[in-house]
Amino acid sequence: SAHHWHDVGQALREVKRVLKPGGVIIVMDVMSPGHPVRDVWLQTVEALRDTSHVRNYSSGEWLTLATEAGLVVNQLLTDRLPLEFSSWVTRMRTSEPLVEAIRLYQQSASAEVKAYFELQEDGSFTSDTILFEAHKAV
């Protein structure tokens, strides 16, 4: 849920402060693809679905945020997560006008965006995820 936090850097600094010696933090979240056009598309879809959305960060942004917070990333894994559209919007109780806006936005996406996110006719798509483990820098 880090993509809902207003100050991820501050949150990671607080994690570092309270982390026991030898302790680790594990973070998993939906991730920005890092490419500007794909990033804008994902952030827009996420914000339409859930008004509490702040930002999905790319792997490079996560590494920078962790390093600036005084953490050392031990391991970083990325993956792809298929999202079934109907259950995805239902989980957040997205209003019908916003569901329609998302569908229209999906339909207007470029061929490159549609291919990258594996957009389906029913609105389902695939998003990137990140999982990383970090410890305090010495």
Language-model features, listed with the residues they occupy:
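Histidine- and/or cysteine-centered catalytic micro-motif in compact active-site loops
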Residues: 1, 30-31, 79
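A short SAM/SAH-binding and catalytic strip from SAM-dependent methyltransferases
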Residues: 1-8
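A short, basic/aromatic alpha-helical/loop segment that forms part
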Residues: 5, 56, 125-127
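A short glycine-rich, Lys/Arg-flanked "PGG" loop and its adjoining helix->strand segment in the class I
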Residues: 9-24
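Short, glycine/charged-enriched secondary-structure capping and boundary segments
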Residues: 10-13, 40-43, 90
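Conserved class I S-adenosyl-L-methionine
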Residues: 24-48
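Acceptor-substrate binding/catalytic loop of class I
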Residues: 46-61
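Conserved Class I S-adenosyl-L-methionine
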Residues: 60-63, 67-138
